[in-house]
Amino acid sequence: MSSSKGDEEINSNNEEMLGIDKLSVDYDYLLYKINDYVNSIQIQTKEVCQRQNELISQNVVEDIVDVNIQSFKDILSKCEELENYFTMLDQIEMISDTFHGRIDDVLKEYRKLNGN
């Protein structure tokens, strides 16, 4: 048993002389830093992508809404013009309905003035 205990001490001394313990710690620390760095990049990338998605969604939606609102305003304006034309037609109808009566009245007055 003493030889295996002595072998462990020699191996331990050899590992310390070669810096294997320090190398192992440095390796673990490097893996930790790489993992931390990757996580940091992941978080930043996710935040940037979310912001871009929100901006794109908002702008696209806002642009679509703005275009739709303008289209509805144009349609409403055309409907109002059409309503004005129908109002004009109603006025023409009223004028034409009373036109014959007014012409008859004018003719009667003319005949009275001329003595016929």
From Swiss-Prot:
Presence of the UniProt keyword Cytoplasm in the record? yes
* Coiled-coil segments on the chain, per record: 63-95
* Record GO biological process: endosome organization; regulation of protein localization
Q: Which domain of life does the UniProt lineage start with? A: Eukaryota
Compartments reported by the entry: Cytoplasm
For this UniProt record, the keywords arranged alphabetically read as follows: Coiled coil, Cytoplasm, Transport
Q: InterPro entries from the xrefs?
A: CNL1
Question: What are the GO cellular component annotations?
Answer: BLOC-1 complex; endosome
Q: What does this protein do?
A: Component of the biogenesis of lysosome-related organelles complex-1 (BLOC-1), a complex that is involved in endosomal cargo sorting.
- Subunit relationships: Component of the biogenesis of lysosome-related organelles complex-1 (BLOC-1).
The record's similarity note reads:
Belongs to the BLOC1S4 family.
What name does this protein carry?
A: Biogenesis of lysosome-related organelles complex 1 subunit CNL1
Q: Which organism is it from?
A: Vanderwaltozyma polyspora (strain ATCC 22028 / DSM 70294 / BCRC 21397 / CBS 2163 / NBRC 10782 / NRRL Y-8283 / UCD 57-17)
Q: Which gene encodes it?
A: CLN1
